[in-house]
């Protein structure tokens, strides 16, 4: 589905940021990028929707080079959920959720119908929430709306950059359960960045552990736990609660 082929990123000022990344993300997979601060995990994710461009190598989606995609089309087909919830403050919940379908020219009545279905699925009563503004929502409710906005138009790829790290433990656990349920239902190829190994182990089909712009180990949670590639993997699993 997504292939990184000898991908590197070098900054003239700070030097190498990513070094010769070569791996694939399978269609329908929940793929987690994890590592310490400065490891390059968020940069690796942002290459997929070309918020950042690599300096060497190729990235392909379903065999097509990213550079050959129309940029607007690529981003409309890629859902994106951030830690800082980017709901438009002057737009209602209904308007926020409908933003991408509207940009894609989808039927408004069908979008509203699907919005109601998705709100119900995530435990938010449509009649109570559709006309609310973001200022009237809790942090967990805002993140639920952000997730719905990202998936309502059936993106090929869902990118999630530490989406739950600012939430309290209860809300965080609830949203982890929710995104796992949505992923299993809609079979979206999901690329998820976190610094929390507990979260990675709970969600991932495979984990890509990075350090200093390189892949240290890529495998299932059990493989990282039971067959660590080196001492760094052992320590990271232990210190981050994954052991």
List where the protein language model places each region:
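ABC ATPase "signature
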Residues: 218-219, 227
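Helix-to-loop junction immediately C-terminal to a conserved catalytic motif
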Residues: 49
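Catalytic Walker B motif of ABC-type/P-loop ATPase nucleotide-binding domains
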Residues: 158-161
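Conserved ABC ATPase "signature" region
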Residues: 109-128, 181
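Conserved catalytic motifs of ABC-family nucleotide-binding domains
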Residues: 154
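Conserved ABC ATPase signature
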Residues: 132-137, 141
């Amino acid at each position: 589905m997504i292939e990184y082929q000898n991908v590197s990123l070098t900054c003239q000022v700070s030097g190498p940021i990513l070094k010769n990344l070569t791996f694939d993300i399978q269609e329908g997979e929940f793929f987690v990028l994890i590592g310490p601060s400065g490891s390059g995990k968020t940069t690796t994710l942002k290459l997929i929707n070309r918020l950042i461009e690599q300096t060497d190598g190729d990235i392909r989606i379903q065999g097509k080079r990213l550079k050959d995609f129309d940029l607007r089309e690529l981003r409309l087909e890629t859902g994106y959920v951030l830690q800082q919830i980017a709901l438009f403050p002057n737009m209602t919940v209904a308007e926020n959720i409908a933003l991408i379908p509207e940009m894609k020219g989808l039927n408004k009545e069908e979008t509203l119908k699907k919005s109601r279905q998705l709100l119900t699925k995530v435990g938010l009563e449509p009649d109570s929430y559709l006309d609310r503004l973001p200022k009237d929502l809790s942090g967990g409710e805002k993140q639920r709306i952000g997730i719905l906005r990202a998936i309502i138009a059936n993106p090929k790829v869902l990118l999630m950059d530490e989406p739950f790290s600012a939430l309290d433990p209860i809300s965080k656990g609830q949203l982890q359960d929710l995104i796992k349920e949505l992923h299993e239902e809609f079979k979206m190829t999901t690329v998820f960045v976190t610094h929390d190994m507990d979260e990675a182990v709970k969600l991932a089909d495979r984990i890509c552990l990075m350090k200093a712009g390189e892949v240290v180990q890529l495998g299932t949670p059990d493989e990282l736990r039971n067959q660590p590639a080196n001492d760094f993997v052992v320590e990271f699993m232990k210190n981050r609660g994954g052991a």
